[in-house]
């Protein structure tokens, strides 16, 4: 194998795929990146796979001799990322000694490095899905859905299906939902986009029976992949009984599906409320950021006091043996006043994801779920469970 490529192309490709390399590989080759050079098509393809998540990326290179090799992911990335911008050469001597048959030489204008790899034939193939019509999703749909829901997925691996985001068709939109048992985020992201002939790329019939739960880890990598793309660019998605595959240009992401029925989250959302508070989102966030400095690290609570006659919302925190902090802000309050407490982190996560400046908080008496929604813009619901106050 011998090729010449740009340092920037190889470095960005390695940064992307290396995120699918296992930190504790069950086999040495899973700690490596697979490099495949094709002289006929003049491209270099990079692949990483931890048997659950796989990422593949290709780019143009001057391939003088085709070949395949796997190289240690972290070592290769550390070297290439530090090389100066410009052309670099990767070469393997096929006639080398038996012990050096996988020795790869990396040459740049600054110097020369040699890395010993492992046989490419030992690297597991990425899963494929055959005979399934791909769903073409606008990047804007994925960006909106993931930005509004991904943060609420559970990080507790024992909760299995809750460590993912549930995505399902809803009319001409995709509904993204995530919950960790303490909060729930639901986003309805429109999919309407037309091709050059003015025809809808995706229709309600395409989404009618679509539903899948995908690990949050895989979707975070997808979010990074599409971040630099245009909103009208299309991502291909195919799903079978066990796998999901996203493709965008020369990039591909594969992931296992999460098995099991996702909770019926619609039933958790109250339909009627006794109190409604309308307020400015950014003002609330900055007030929370200030008072959170004094929040008790053990429970991380903030108490909201609704002062209905005066249309004031008071925020208060208490840290035992440290002190007390409070702030007030204007708010439009409909219904009786009262007190309610929240975990500050859960509250802040949701407020930062809401897409509009003016938001509404809807609540009932006692410790029933509280709903936050944006006024205008994207249709999003953020449900958070309040914390019981002990007098």
Swiss-Prot record:
Pfam families: DNA_pol3_beta, DNA_pol3_beta_2, DNA_pol3_beta_3. PANTHER family: BETA SLIDING CLAMP (PTHR30478:SF0), DNA POLYMERASE III SUBUNIT BETA (PTHR30478). SMART domains: POL3Bc. CDD domains: beta_clamp. It comes from Synechocystis sp. (strain ATCC 27184 / PCC 6803 / Kazusa). GO terms for molecular function: 3'-5' exonuclease activity; DNA binding; DNA-directed DNA polymerase activity. It is found in: Cytoplasm. Gene3D superfamilies: 3.70.10.10, DNA Polymerase III, subunit A, domain 2. Confers DNA tethering and processivity to DNA polymerases and other proteins. Acts as a clamp, forming a ring around DNA (a reaction catalyzed by the clamp-loading complex) which diffuses in an ATP-independent manner freely and bidirectionally along dsDNA. Initially characterized for its ability to contact the catalytic subunit of DNA polymerase III (Pol III), a complex, multichain enzyme responsible for most of the replicative synthesis in bacteria; Pol III exhibits 3'-5' exonuclease proofreading activity. GO terms for biological process: DNA strand elongation involved in DNA replication. Belongs to the beta sliding clamp family. This is Beta sliding clamp. Forms a ring-shaped head-to-tail homodimer around DNA which binds and tethers DNA polymerases and other proteins to the DNA. The DNA replisome complex has a single clamp-loading complex (3 tau and 1 each of delta, delta', psi and chi subunits) which binds 3 Pol III cores (1 core on the leading strand and 2 on the lagging strand) each with a beta sliding clamp dimer. Additional proteins in the replisome are other copies of gamma, psi and chi, Ssb, DNA helicase and RNA primase. The gene is dnaN. GO terms for cellular component: cytoplasm; DNA polymerase III complex. Keywords: Cytoplasm, DNA replication, DNA-binding, DNA-directed DNA polymerase, Nucleotidyltransferase, Transferase.
């Amino acid at each position: 194998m011998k090729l010449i490529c740009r340092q920037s192309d190889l470095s960005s490709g390695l940064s992307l795929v290396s995120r699918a390399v296992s930190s504790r590989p069950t086999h040495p080759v899973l700690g490596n990146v697979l490099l495949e050079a094709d002289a006929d098509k003049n491209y270099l393809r990079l692949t990483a796979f931890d048997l659950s998540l796989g990422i593949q990326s290709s780019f143009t290179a001057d391939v003088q001799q085709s070949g395949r090799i796997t190289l240690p992911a972290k070592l290769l990335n550390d070297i290439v990322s530090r090389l100066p911008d410009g052309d670099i050469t990767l070469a393997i001597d096929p006639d080398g000694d038996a012990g050096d048959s996988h020795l790869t030489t990396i040459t740049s204008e600054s110097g020369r490095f040699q890395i010993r790899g492992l046989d490419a034939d030992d690297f597991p193939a990425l899963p494929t899905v055959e005979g399934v019509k791909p769903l073409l999703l606008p990047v804007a749909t994925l960006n909106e859905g993931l930005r509004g829901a991904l943060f609420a997925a559970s990080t507790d691996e024992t909760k299995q299906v809750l460590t993912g985001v549930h995505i399902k068709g809803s009319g001409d939109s995709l509904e993204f939902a995530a919950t960790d048992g303490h909060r729930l985020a639901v986003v309805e992201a429109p999919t309407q986009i037309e091709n050059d002939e003015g025809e809808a790329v995706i229709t309600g019939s395409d989404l009618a029976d679509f539903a899948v739960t995908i690990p949050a880890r895989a979707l975070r990598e997808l979010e990074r992949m599409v971040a630099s793309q245009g909103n009208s660019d299309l991502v291909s998605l195919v799903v079978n009984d066990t796998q999901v595959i996203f493709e965008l240009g020369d990039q591909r992401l594969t992931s296992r599906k999460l098995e099991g029925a996702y909770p019926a989250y619609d039933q958790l959302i109250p339909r009627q409320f006794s109190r409604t508070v309308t307020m400015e989102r950014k003002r609330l966030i900055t007030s929370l950021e200030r008072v959170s400095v004094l929040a008790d690290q053990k429970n991380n609570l903030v108490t909201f006091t609704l002062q209905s006659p005066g249309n004031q919302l008071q925020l208060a925190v208490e840290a035992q043996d440290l002190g007390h902090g409070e702030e007030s802000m204007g708010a439009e309050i409909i219904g009786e006043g009262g007190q309610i407490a929240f975990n500050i982190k859960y509250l802040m996560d949701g407020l930062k994801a809401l897409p509009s400046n003016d938001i509404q908080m809807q609540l009932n008496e006692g410790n029933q779920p509280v709903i936050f929604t944006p006024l205008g813009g994207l249709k999003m619901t953020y449900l958070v469970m309040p914390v019981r106050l002990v007098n």
